[in-house]
Amino acid sequence: MMFSRFFKAVPARAPAFSSPLPVYQARTMATVRNQRPVERATFTIRDGPIFHGKSFGARTTISGEAVFTTSLVGYPESLTDPSYRGQILVFTQPLIGNYGVPSTERDRHGLLKYFESPNLQAAGVVVADVAEQYSHWTAVQSLGEWCAREGVPAISGVDTRAIVTYLREQGSSLARITVGEEYDADQDEAFTDPEQIHLVRQVSTKAPFHVSAADPQCHVAVLDCGVKENILRSLVSRGASITVFPFDYPIHKVAHHFDGVFISNGPGDPTHCQDTTYHLRRLMETSQVPIFGICLGHQLLALAAGARTVKLKYGNRAHNIPALDLTTGRCHITSQNHGYAVDASTLPSDWKPYFVNLNDSSNEGMIHKSRPIFSTQFHPEAKGGPLDSSYLFDIYIDSVKKYKNSQLAFHPSRETIPSPLLVDLLPKERVDVAPTIGMQNVAAAAAAAAAATA
């Protein structure tokens, strides 16, 4: 009887928010800070609750869209994923940072082994508890040291269960991390909305670069909307040398030099990339080249085909989301990170849904009925996450090789293998991609860029 009364007294979920601006005090942290002085920090959701905690990152104030991930591991990969540009990432896993942050070591292809881009991409980090004492053979620094070095504020000691409950019920919201200051309700102008910023322009390479395969068997053009390193690795490791272009490059004008076209993941609203969708539409009208898109690339391909996209209430960000392959009836556990989705009901008649999300029934992929063109909303390259759907890269590369052989049958002199001159002249990594230095600075940079092109 005593135990039954006890369990009845414990709520099964975070409490509802009865007032518009409740204040939640920081809880006692489980990790030891070795008596280091800790500075106060505040996480404020616009028109929502305020959470007081402790700063463990850069001493700066930022704002952006607050989103959450339920991934248990893979925080170095998540935080360097360009798709998180402009977002304050809330981790539901209670303890973050216990295996530290790895080095910037590169593999034999010149790609980063442990990160998905050279810089920390999230605008801010929110955790319940941060581990300052880390242990892993690849670790070279703590999560706090990394955030401070990258200029990204981070807050710990807050009730992430309450934060996630609010975001699930109210939807992804604008929020702010303030370090060493009290919340001022009159400072709503400080909330920067990343949806109003062309974030893809911030993360895309500014000039083409090339990555060679050890044994090149085909040549793929990649549109960089914020491409992850493991996507490039997934292509190169399968024998595809790749040339990576800026997101708005007129790919339809050079597609005849390539055996396939790939459209990468990236941040923000897909409707901002109107030049990209136009170029993809022209590509599908003028070429039979195989095309594969992932995440934002899936959405851009859908827009180019004539479909529409919608913004989800709070998005899907996790490493364990089930997606059903509608062609085989098999379920795959997938890694996802997106706030928009394709409206499958708007797909043209020559397209059909490929995958569907078994949690919320949202579209997870589409495939052309007669051509080698398909795309997925989830990330088959994982990193982090399961590799259930990595076979999709094999399907794509097989179609690329088949296309190459068919073209050689009609045009024996056709050559798509990159020349040594091209390989020597082009850079081997992203060109002029600025790091995240706080969303207010990103917004200022975007405004300056818009003024310069006006």
Curated annotation (Swiss-Prot):
Which EC number(s) are documented for this chain? 6.3.5.5
GO molecular function per UniProt:
ATP binding; carbamoyl-phosphate synthase (glutamine-hydrolyzing) activity; glutaminase activity
InterPro entries cross-referenced by the UniProt entry = CarbamoylP_synth_ssu, CarbamoylP_synth_ssu_N, CarbP_synth_ssu_N_sf, Class_I_gatase-like, CPSase_GATase1, GATASE
Q: In which pathway does it act?
A: Amino-acid biosynthesis; L-arginine biosynthesis; carbamoyl phosphate from bicarbonate: step 1/1
Its GO CC terms are: carbamoyl-phosphate synthase complex; cytoplasm; mitochondrial matrix
- Catalytic activity as recorded in UniProt: hydrogencarbonate + L-glutamine + 2 ATP + H2O = carbamoyl phosphate + L-glutamate + 2 ADP + phosphate + 2 H(+)
The enzyme's main class, written as a single word, is: ligase
Which SMART domains does the record associate with it? CPSase_sm_chain
Write out the GO biological process terms: 'de novo' pyrimidine nucleobase biosynthetic process; glutamine metabolic process; L-arginine biosynthetic process; pyrimidine nucleotide biosynthetic process
Residues annotated as domain Glutamine amidotransferase type-1:
219-406
Output the Pfam families linked to this UniProt entry.
CPSase_sm_chain, GATase
Disulphide bridges, residue numbers: none
Q: Into which family does the record put it?
A: Belongs to the CarA family.
Oligomer and partners: Heterodimer composed of 2 chains; the small (or glutamine) chain promotes the hydrolysis of glutamine to ammonia, which is used by the large (or ammonia) chain to synthesize carbamoyl phosphate.
Q: What name goes with this protein? A: Carbamoyl phosphate synthase arginine-specific small chain
